[in-house]
Amino acid sequence: PDTTTHTGTEDCEIAVVRYLQKFASSRPAPLLRGYVQLATTVVPGKHVALDNANLNPTVAAAPIRLNGAQVYGVDTPHYLGPTIVATKDRPTRVLFRNLLPTGMAGDLFLPVDTTMMGAGEGPNAMMLDPITKVPMDMATNDGTVLDQVRNPVCGQDPKPASCYSENRAIVHLHGGITPWISDGNPHQWTTPAGDSSDYPKGVSMQNVPDMPDPGPGAQTFFYTNQQSARLLFYHDHAWGITRLNVYAGEAAPYLITDDTEKKLVAPGGALDGVDMGNSGLGHSLTIEDKTFVPDAAKVAHNDPTWNYAKWGGQGNLWTPHVYMPAQNPGAATGNSPFGRWMYGPWFWPPSTDQKYKPIANPYYDPTCDANVQPFCEPAQIPSTPNVSVGMEAFHDTPIVNGTAYPKTTVDPKAYRFRILNAADDRFWNLSWFVADPTTGTMTEVALKKSEVTAAQSDPVVQPTVDQTLSPKGPDWVQIGTDSGFLPTPAVVPAQDVTYITDPTRFDFGNADKHALL
């Protein structure tokens, strides 16, 4: 960091850019958005010329220029970077620049539900009811899959300037004690300099008063660091697209250290002799889950509405974008094996006050016999838009520090890990078990074969560890959380997750036993 520009604080310049990076050596590199530290005269680093990559990897990346000059980074943009290391009570100042492309070129490469607040029409696109003064719904509702309710105007290409753009970005320090002007809340985003959107910045965006105004497409932040040692993280928080920006890569660790921690790791301290890694701060593990676009044949079978041109082909990030109800009135059982959500009009008792009722299904076949055919389309379908947001997603590929299914070699000694759960909505039950000696790779834990077989056809079954082949390994010793050090260490042995199955209990279905969860 820069310790000379402002007395008593540490300064750094950070930008958001687009880049390509592989999560596995055998897979294509998906397009990502992420943070990179900018090179300055005080902190030049490796002085890497920055550019914005494209969804089509055959198209050359566009050099990033600011006021006509090439922009340089301290390092090459990489996933979950840069980590900011701060000291308790020594503030950090951040100059943030949104260096994403302008206009359509800067659109997200993920499905955006523009009916979400902050992702679609802005105030300039709205008309007030002359009597109630409430914004009117301008979409034409013809009750078909092609009308404006199902295909919002802000989801079209190009979208009107009165719609919120998809290249908005911000920095929010999650868990920090921060003045409101530097919170990075959903209404403090900025667009890149020169963008044609009607809304170049959020309505509550403010710069730090004693720092120079960085101009359009940039803003300044002041973090107090008035907290004990802990692992936090900073991430995007732009209104309406936070979940997508973070999924695309806009997140990174933020470490605060203090004198107490220094005493613990010093010679003779409680953590003396524990492996702290090359940084001396512990081994950071950021655990996520993602899904990647498969080959064209699988996409055609499983997700025929996926837009290759807009969201990317094989190897790029995939996320749910179709509202799939768990009910199917056209099926003999009334259920849909593909569904995820309960649709109100098909629930019991059915909801009747929704603004947009179910609409005619263009794929309905009245001759389909649900008692004979494996699947029949219902006469009606939900009136949800194309694209529809998913309330949550449980992705199929675990990612640790930007690598899918990673492995590492350790010595028989104690290590300090700093673990951040950055999954979309998934909890991780972390345990140590001895590797299955029958696999040959020594990287897999043995699971009970009968449960593995049952799980192939029953998603309710969750295979547990076969401890005859993979006995329990060492315990975890938990010493802290994102609220600082614990008053006393907690020993956490290996344990499969079990669930409360007594339907008479109020917490029926909750996790019962677990390890480090």
Question: Where are the model-predicted features located?
Answer:
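Histidine-centered copper-binding motifs that mark active-site loops
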Residues: 1-517
